[in-house]
């Protein structure tokens, strides 16, 4: 089968023919040619979208060359005036002046619209072919960093900036920097709202129909690209391709810490910050810092309340429509993502992915201080506070720090003895809702995870694994000082205080300190004149002191 070249499928118009087309026909021509080029790409022709656009612009330049010839032969400008304005309707290069002065090749007489086009043409006489509009397979400019090839020097230089981080084009409105002039122009539409394609839902404007079409899907919920591996769907082909890297691991940018791969250096750099802790985007109002500009923008909306997408229930603003849809599920209770293992449902895909690691045992996030591994990044960040003590919520009794107020509030109850959650079956009380839910499984026997030895049920796989150690006798936590081994990480932490002498619990009334929260609580009750624990057995009532062996529970 003969190879197919772009000129074999291209439809070229003369000046007179083009002038007879109405705007809708011209638009149809553009759409058909773009689709034709993409079909060629599917059967073996490979080129960048930029090359398609360059070829298309070249067709416009050919038409303009015809126009120039018509102008040079005609004494009356108005004979070609209407055709001229219609050709400019192509919007291929808005900066082309009304009177174009063509550049002529001195070797063959061929005429070009730009000096750069003439320079490329002259190289063809000299035997150099750095770029040829007719040979789309040729990409002589290869990136040394990632191996990606380009057909034009301009595209290659623009790509190199993704590696160097150079962003020479800054937005005069907000200061955000970009690697190319087209990028900053597209960004400026956010400020001016002057794009030719405007969303009827939110008013956001775009300079290209493809971007506008993708954006519309954020409102309609349409996701035409579905992953055959996990059935997750996406609104755009680039999003789908980035997702596939998770399955194949074939991205050109691979993290040395965790092995995760990425298709773009910008995403790779942001990911690296999750390991280094770097947060270059800082909020001037509250001092909170972020690893990415997108996260920073989302945060700023909390201060300004000025996001483009607002929750219809509570009015909270968001930067993306996907964020507001996710948030609205907190009001509706909708949980569309289901775990294939246990049937548990979640409101977001990220939450179900994190949950699935409790089944697989995967813990990709490791603490650099002690080596402990975690299933999610927030988990390892919360854990790091134990080492750094830098959490925003600090306990006044023992000095322990926390990253969120709910965790801090639960911890405070270990000092005050408050247990607001009481079991209606046996009367036992708990400091948190999570603990009473775990306890209720003892009564109902209805937990999703059951011990294979005794049938006891649990609410999460980590709990059943810990319980199974009571049958196997496994004690994976060993004290480095004395060699004593323990079933639980919490048990060894409490035991280590016998070596260090640490007593984190201090009585505010007399200053006495304690190693264990249970000892501290008993002491506080002595000040208050409260009796420790009263148990009723039939008609008998008696006081009991909890055994030290249970202090870690």
Swiss-Prot record:
Paired cysteines (S-S): none
Function noted in UniProt: May be involved in transcriptional regulation.
Native source species: Homo sapiens
Domain of life: Eukaryota
Compartmental location: Nucleus
UniProt-listed CDD domains: KRAB_A-box
Family statement drawn from the similarity comment of this UniProt entry: Belongs to the krueppel C2H2-type zinc-finger protein family.
Gene3D superfamilies the record matches: 6.10.140.140, Classic Zinc Finger
MF terms (GO), sorted A to Z: DNA-binding transcription factor activity; RNA polymerase II cis-regulatory region sequence-specific DNA binding; zinc ion binding
Chain's gene name: ZNF564
GO biological processes: regulation of transcription by RNA polymerase II
Keyword terms of this UniProt record: DNA-binding, Isopeptide bond, Metal-binding, Nucleus, Repeat, Transcription, Transcription regulation, Ubl conjugation, Zinc, Zinc-finger
UniProt keyword Cell membrane present: no
A cellular component annotation (GO) from this entry: nucleus
Cross-link (Glycyl lysine isopeptide (Lys-Gly) (interchain with G-Cter in SUMO2)): 438
Zinc finger (C2H2-type) in chain: 103-125, 141-163, 169-191, 197-219, 225-247, 253-275, 281-303, 309-331, 337-359, 365-387, 393-415, 421-443, 449-471, 477-499, 505-527
Protein name, UniProt field: Zinc finger protein 564
Primary location recorded for the protein, binned into one broad class: nucleus
Domain KRAB intervals: 4-83
């Amino acid at each position: 089968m003969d190879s197919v070249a772009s000129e074999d499928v291209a439809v070229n118009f003369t000046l007179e023919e083009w002038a007879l087309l109405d705007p809708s026909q011209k638009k149809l021509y553009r759409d058909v040619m773009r689709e034709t080029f993409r079909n060629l790409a599917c059967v073996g022709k490979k080129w960048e979208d930029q090359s398609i656009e360059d070829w298309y612009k070249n067709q416009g330049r050919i038409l303009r060359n015809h126009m120039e010839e018509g102008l040079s032969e005609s004494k009356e400008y108005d004979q070609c005036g209407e055709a001229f304005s219609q050709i400019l309707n192509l919007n291929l290069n808005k900066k082309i002046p009304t009177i174009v002065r063509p550049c002529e090749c001195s070797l063959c007489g061929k005429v070009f619209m730009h000096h750069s086009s003439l320079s490329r043409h002259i190289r063809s006489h000299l035997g150099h072919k750095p770029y040829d509009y007719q040979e789309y397979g040729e990409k002589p400019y290869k990136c040394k960093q990632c191996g990606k090839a380009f057909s034009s020097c301009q595209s290659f230089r623009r790509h190199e900036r993704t590696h160097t981080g150079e962003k020479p084009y800054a937005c005069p409105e907000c200061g955000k920097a970009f690697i190319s002039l087209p990028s900053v122009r597209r960004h400026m539409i956010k400020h001016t709202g002057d794009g030719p394609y405007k969303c009827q839902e939110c008013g956001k404007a775009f300079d290209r129909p493809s971007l506008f079409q993708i954006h519309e899907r954020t409102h309609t919920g349409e996701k035409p690209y579905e992953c055959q591996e996990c059935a997750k769907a996406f609104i755009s082909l680039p999003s789908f391709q980035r997702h596939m890297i998770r399955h194949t691991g074939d991205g050109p940018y691979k993290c040395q810490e965790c092995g995760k791969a990425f298709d773009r250096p910008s995403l790779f750099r942001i990911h690296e910050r999750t390991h280094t802790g770097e947060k270059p985007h800082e909020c001037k109002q509250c001092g909170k810092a972020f690893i990415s500009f997108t996260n920073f923008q989302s945060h700023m909306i909390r201060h300004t309340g000025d996001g483009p997408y607002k929750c219809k229930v509570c009015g909270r603003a968001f930067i993306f429509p996907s964020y507001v849809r996710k948030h609205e599920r907190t009001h509706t209770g909708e949980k569309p993502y289901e775990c294939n293992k246990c049937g548990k449902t979640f409101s977001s895909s990220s939450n179900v992915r994190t949950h699935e690691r409790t089944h697989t045992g995967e813990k990709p996030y490791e603490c650099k201080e002690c080596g402990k591994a975690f299933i999610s990044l927030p988990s390892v960040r919360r854990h790091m506070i134990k080492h750094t003590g830098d959490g925003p919520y600090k306990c006044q009794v023992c000095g322990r720090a926390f990253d969120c107020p709910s965790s801090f509030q639960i911890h405070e109850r270990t000092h005050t003895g408050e247990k607001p959650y009481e079991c209606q079956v046996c009367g036992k009380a708990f400091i948190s809702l999570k603990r009473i839910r775990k306890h209720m499984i003892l009564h109902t026997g209805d937990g999703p995870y059951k011990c294979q030895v005794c049938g006891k049920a649990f609410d999460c796989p980590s709990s059943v694994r810990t319980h199974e150690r009571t049958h196997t006798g496994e004690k994976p936590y060993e004290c480095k000082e004395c060699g004593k081994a323990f079933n639980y990480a919490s048990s060894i932490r409490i035991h280590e205080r016998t070596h260090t002498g640490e007593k984190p619990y201090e009585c505010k009334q007399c200053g006495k300190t304690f190693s264990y929260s249970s000892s501290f609580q008993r002491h506080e009750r002595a000040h208050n004149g409260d009796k420790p624990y009263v148990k009723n057995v039939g008609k008998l009532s008696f006081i009991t002191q909890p055994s030290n062996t249970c202090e870690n529970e």
